Amino acid sequence: MAAAEEPKPKKLKVEAPQALSENVLFGMGNPLLDISAVVDKDFLDKYSLKPNDQILAEEKHKELFDELVRKFKVEYHAGGSTQNSIKVAQWMIQKPHKAATFFGCIGIDKFGEILKSKAAEAHVDAHYYEQNEQPTGTCAACITGDNRSLVANLAAANCYKKEKHLDLENNWVLVEKARVYYIAGFFLTVSPESVLKVARYAAENNRIFTLNLSAPFISQFFKESLMEVMPYVDILFGNETEAATFAREQGFETKDIKEIAKKAQALAKVNSKRPRTVVFTQGRDDTVVATENEVMAFAVLDQNQKEIIDTNGAGDAFVGGFLSQLVYNKPLTECIRAGHYAASVIIRRTGCTFPEKPDFH
């Protein structure tokens, strides 16, 4: 009997993930408090918002935040695209706590305190640059059906300073500890020099640097910063709308998402040891992945439409799930599967929130 059971431990050994060290995953971005509500079309029209978009607040949106709170039933959630992804990754990883690090700028105020306590609850090692010139940033998530229109008032998030935070020895040490880096394209509007410093470090040390296209306006109005960092990007994330805008801005002359992924994959690259991978999600449609040799499509998990509560954060959650397996050097297919799993959990809840433990095997 004993002989027949012998191979078992061996099998377990192969599959048991290697123990992770703290701070193995590093993220940097705009920490925002999400103020989300289900709104009507009139509200979107009043502030000329598209149903499914991400924009930065302008003068004409000043009243929007007050009206949202006054007119609709709002929920407050700790948000910000990168911070969401980092939290989801930490949730999927579970142990050790503080496997994930997050940098960003907040104000010295109530909202800032909420973000700090929420990061601690999620076991993320958050190191915020705190300043009192601007209040903590907020993001209005205006939900209609399974669309969400995001209006970000960056405020404090916009005040992140490389020389005041990233460059400090006790902070930079955390960058050096990481093996995988993730920054949403949104942060290019705040501190492109911080993004570049981390990206260069990753390339020089053959570590994995990942970036998200984040929103159509990044490819349009922050093209220079985006393309300056692109040669350092090992894994590029985005959704179908962002991919289409990126392709148009780059003169790819195709609207086919697989072709776009292929062309983005082939853009110039600094660290030739790591060919780029491009991952484009498309809501309920297949996720498209381009590697050096092929373009593949992966079906998302079947979801009962009635169970979908809030698609805000689905893209962030996908990235978080993906990163949670990437830190273990799992194959691409496993990273995608984890991404799809995490997104499927998040869309059944309000905000980018999750149950106590994941059920991913």
UniProtKB/Swiss-Prot annotation:
Keywords: ATP-binding, Kinase, Magnesium, Metal-binding, Nucleotide-binding, Nucleus, Phosphoprotein, Purine salvage, Transferase. The active site is at D316. GO terms for molecular function: adenosine kinase activity; ATP binding; deoxyadenosine kinase activity; metal ion binding. Adenosine binds at D34, Q305. Mg(2+) 2 binds at D146, N147. The N-terminus is blocked. InterPro entries: Adenokinase, Carboh/pur_kinase_PfkB_CS, PfkB_dom, Ribokinase-like. It is found in: Nucleus. Binds 3 Mg(2+) ions per subunit. Gene3D superfamilies: 3.40.1190.20. Mg(2+) 1 binds at S48. Its cofactor is Mg(2+). The modification Phosphotyrosine is found at Y76. It catalyses: adenosine + ATP = AMP + ADP + H(+). Activity is inhibited by 5-iodotubercidin and 5'-amino-5'-deoxyadenosine. GO terms for biological process: AMP salvage; dAMP salvage; dATP biosynthetic process; GMP salvage; purine nucleobase metabolic process; purine ribonucleoside salvage. Its EC number is 2.7.1.20. One of its GO terms (cellular component) is plasma membrane. A motif (Nuclear localization signal) lies at residues 7-15. Pathway: Purine metabolism; AMP biosynthesis via salvage pathway; AMP from adenosine: step 1/1. Monomer. PANTHER family: ADENOSINE KINASE (PTHR45769:SF3). Belongs to the carbohydrate kinase PfkB family. This is Adenosine kinase. The lineage of its organism: Eukaryota, Metazoa, Chordata, Craniata, Vertebrata.
